[in-house]
């Protein structure tokens, strides 16, 4: 019976893992030309936030200062410097334009992907139920020592001493995937907040659920943790 459930739930599990990647790849290619054409036609400034505007101004000022310094050292004529500034400004505008296109593209793709996955989960309720029952049966058959070791390993990975670097990479990757500009302050705030929230949830879960369901597991977990 357990093997039958495992084989039945494997296609559903594989579809959950690979479907988001396939949807993202397909819709990225399909939407790219449409979003590029829409953005270049509308020239909308809706998605220009204060952080992006500040970054562009800083880059432009830095660029101008570098060219002026180069002029003082090499004694270039003023017209030559102006041409270089004009050329680099156009390049900066192109980069800014492409950044906005990628932001809209990634955001649109993620929204579509989330909607399709939500519909798939609702329609595939039977497969989700079989997968859930198989996972519960698999976990139930494990010994308390293995369960305690697994919980300890996961907690050390997620909220341990070395976890902030992993959280920083993961949050930065998600932030980039949604097309937003990199912001150290926001990422640092999330990195310092998420592990604390997870630690609180874990302690509450151990206190409310594990103490009632498997007291021996809690004893083994605390012994390993100490």
UniProtKB/Swiss-Prot annotation:
InterPro entries, A to Z: CemA
UniProt subcellular location: Plastid, Chloroplast inner membrane
GO BP annotation list: potassium ion transport
The keyword Kinase belongs to this UniProt entry's keyword annotation: no
Purpose: Contributes to K(+)/H(+) antiport activity by supporting proton efflux to control proton extrusion and homeostasis in chloroplasts in a light-dependent manner to modulate photosynthesis. Prevents excessive induction of non-photochemical quenching (NPQ) under continuous-light conditions. Indirectly promotes efficient inorganic carbon uptake into chloroplasts.
Membrane topology (UniProt): Multi-pass membrane protein
Originating gene: cemA
TM stretches of this protein: 7-27, 111-131, 186-206
Entry similarity comment: Belongs to the CemA family.
A Pfam family it matches: CemA
Annotated GO CC locations: chloroplast inner membrane
Protein's UniProt name: Potassium/proton antiporter CemA
Keywords: Antiport, Chloroplast, Hydrogen ion transport, Ion transport, Membrane, Plastid, Plastid inner membrane, Potassium, Potassium transport, Transmembrane, Transmembrane helix, Transport
Molecular functions (GO terms): antiporter activity; proton transmembrane transporter activity
HAMAP family: CemA_PxcA (MF_01308)
Reactions the enzyme catalyzes: K(+)(in) + H(+)(out) = K(+)(out) + H(+)(in)
Domain of life: Eukaryota
């Amino acid at each position: 019976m357990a093997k039958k459930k495992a084989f039945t739930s494997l296609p559903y599990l594989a579809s959950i893992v690979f479907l988001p990647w396939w949807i993202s790849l397909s819709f990225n290619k399909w939407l790219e030309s449409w979003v590029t054409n829409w953005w270049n036609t509308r020239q909308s400034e809706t998605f220009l936030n204060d952080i992006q505007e500040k970054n562009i101004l800083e880059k432009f000022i830095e660029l101008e200062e570098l060219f002026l310094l180069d002029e003082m050292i090499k004694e270039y004529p003023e017209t030559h410097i102006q041409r270089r500034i004009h050329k680099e400004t156009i390049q900066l505008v192109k980069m800014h334009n492409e950044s906005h296109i990628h932001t809209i593209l990634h955001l649109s793709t993620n929204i579509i992907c989330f909607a399709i996955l939500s519909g798939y989960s609702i329609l595939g309720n039977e497969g989700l139920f079989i997968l859930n029952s198989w996972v519960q049966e698999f976990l139930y058959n494990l010994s308390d020592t293995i369960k305690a070791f697994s919980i300890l390993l996961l907690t050390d990975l997620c909220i341990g001493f070395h976890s902030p670097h992993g959280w920083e990479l993961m949050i930065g990757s998600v932030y980039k995937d949604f097309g937003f500009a990199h912001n150290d302050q926001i990422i640092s705030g999330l990195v310092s907040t998420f592990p604390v929230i997870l630690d609180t949830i874990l302690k509450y879960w151990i206190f409310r659920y594990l103490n009632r369901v498997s007291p021996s597991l809690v004893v083994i977990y605390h012994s390993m943790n100490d």
